[in-house]
Amino acid sequence: MPLATPKMFLALGLAAMTAVLSGCNTYKPAPKAFQQATIQPYTLDSGDRLRITVFDQPSMTNSYTVDQAGYIAFPLVGQVPARGRTLQQLSGQLAGKLRQGYLRDPDVTIDVDRYRSIFVMGEVGQPGQYAYVPGLTVQNAIAVAGGYTSRANQASVDVTRKINGQVITGRVNISSAIIAGDTIYVRERLF
């Protein structure tokens, strides 16, 4: 049996390196629905605080938070489902419920008083939970979280987002827009 030669060691080393590195890119680019979620009308979820105004009804005008079950508790009508609805849909739903024996022609407007949080994890200076503001990008969120560590992969990040009730993770570049509720994970670079 021939002894191992330097060429054989080189070939085995390259084969092992190829096998190891082929597992490094297990994420696919974000699906189309992932990107489209950033341009769709905002949908409500747990943690959103809403400013609801009922014209000429100061006792009903107040701030209401979407609870963990996805509902708001509104005077006279009780629990109203809010999760997955746009502001316009919820406004119409509340007006409809108020019309059923409470008010003749209710005028309901809704604004987001405070969006649900985003989370920034991984190779950033201060991982944690942060307030979302409309127009926030991955790069802005990383800056708010103390910037990159020296080990961070600065080319792209993994964002986990709930779309149509499903939790999806996609790899995006740092100029990508984010939405309320996103979790951003900055990976460690290989070299």
Question: What is each of the regions a protein language model found here?
Answer:
Residues 2-6, 10-13, 21-191:
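Ser/Thr/Pro/Gly-biased, low-complexity, turn-/loop-rich segments
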